[in-house]
Amino acid sequence: MTHIIIDGDACPVVDSIIDLTTETGIFVTIIRSFSHFSNQLYPPHVSTLYVDDGPDAVDYKIVQLSTKDDIVITQDYGLASLLVDKVLIVMHHNGKIYNSKNIQQLLDKRYMNAQIRKQG
């Protein structure tokens, strides 16, 4: 069964995903660090899982929990690169699908931009 896992620390479309999946039978799991804790109540098909605030803790939990039938929503290219061959779909919150053909280019671009920022 398809399940949506959201990298919830910085995802601006959580509410939209929840609205779109209501009454579809698709379960949604939002994974967040404790520093992004929320008291917001969600419908029964939505669960929230909190992890420690450590670096990449949310990413590691998503990798651990995801299966071949899952859809993962993230804007983290590093996380996406770990999942493109593991899950059904990995996508950015803007709808861009990450795949084995485009992920290396995105990682290279991220690296080059970081190098430029270091140079000032």
Language model region names:
Residues 2-120:
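Nuclease catalytic cores that cleave nucleic-acid phosphodiester bonds
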